[in-house]
Amino acid sequence: MVSKQAFLFSLGSLYLSLLFVFLLMDVYARPANNSALKVEGKEKATDNKDENEIMPPDHLNGVKMEMDGHLNKEFHQEVFLGKEIEEFDEDSEPRRNRRKLAAIFAKVDRNEDKQISANEMQRWIMEKTEEHFQEAVNENKLHFRAVDPDGDGHVSWDEYKIKFLASKGFNEKEVAEKLKNNEDLKIDEETQEVLDNLKDRWFQADNPPADQLLNEEEFLSFLHPEHSQGMLKFMVKEIIRDLDQDGDKKLTLSEFISLPVGTVENQQAQDIDDDWVRDRKKEYEEVIDANHDGIVTMEELEEYMDPMNEYNALNEAKQMIAVADENQDHHLSLEEILKYSEYFTGSKLMDYARNVHEEF
């Protein structure tokens, strides 16, 4: 009986061993990395890290409008907090956030009179915008290296195209070989449309005399059009092209507030759409349409979009003060800023009134 059990045990062990060997063989027979799975030359992408490094971002810190024409909802926080914007979190300890905000107040209050004037706020906005600019310059150095592996300081459109398609999951070596041999790339319609738009943008960033190559500075303009007047103008044209319904290259209020593609399916969506219309109507009438003639020209939109426009910074400073200026003295006290902390930081500092005098 014992010998029979031993035999069955040995047989079972042998079966499990064979099963393990077959599974192991199957694993080693597969590609070493999921990214090697191909569909018509396209690899299965594992993440979009590479894409984020070389694609122009939709969101530009310190710029009033997104690349797609949406208003930048975080603009006020970005130009008030600068790089510290991420430090203000709803989950952060309120007392610590109050102290951070008080420290910022002291920096803005240049003449130390315990209140912030429009000129002081304007100077601060320009400083924080420059901070965002420098951050983009530093990031661009890393991103440029990603598309310039040979380090010659110049990148051709084909070199960028190879890296872009690789970030989308295509086999980099296969794409390079096909481009070298002028062979057709099997690219889906959506990716091709993105490529076409990027190509237009690429050649716009190529400063005269055009050599079809981008250096590091030109690549910065390609990723961040706010760093170049020429590219800022191109960005404005793109936004107007997308919103302009009658082709006159100008924007009426109705064109500017037109809802995004899609239908309202429930009350929550309706509320979102109502907010969209209200916010854009206010921005159009009070800020963008500078001469209030009911028409926004390319020049007006370009001036509105320019983050280094000092006149815009002063207007923004006055608007920010007006939001929290409860005593209507055209200045902001620390208490007023703490009370309207959600506007300035995106984080509501609870029980500010009870604590402000204790702490400061």
UniProtKB/Swiss-Prot annotation:
Ca(2+) 1 binds at residues 109, 111, 113, 115, 120. GO terms for molecular function: calcium ion binding. GO terms for cellular component: Golgi lumen. Glycans are attached at residue 33. It is found in: Golgi apparatus lumen. Residues 1-29 form the signal peptide. Its main location: Golgi. InterPro entries: CAB45_EFh, EF-hand-dom_pair, EF_Hand_1_Ca_BS, EF_hand_dom. Ca(2+) 5 binds at residues 325, 327, 329, 331, 336. Keywords: Calcium, Glycoprotein, Golgi apparatus, Metal-binding, Repeat, Signal. Residues 96-131, 135-170, 231-266, 276-311, 312-347 form the EF-hand domain. Ca(2+) 4 binds at residues 289, 291, 293, 300. Ca(2+) 2 binds at residues 148, 150, 152, 154, 159. Pfam families: EF-hand_5, EF-hand_7. Ca(2+) 3 binds at residues 244, 246, 248, 250, 255. PANTHER family: 45 KDA CALCIUM-BINDING PROTEIN (PTHR10827:SF98), RETICULOCALBIN (PTHR10827). Belongs to the CREC family. May regulate calcium-dependent activities in the endoplasmic reticulum lumen or post-ER compartment. This is 45 kDa calcium-binding protein. It comes from Xenopus tropicalis (Western clawed frog).
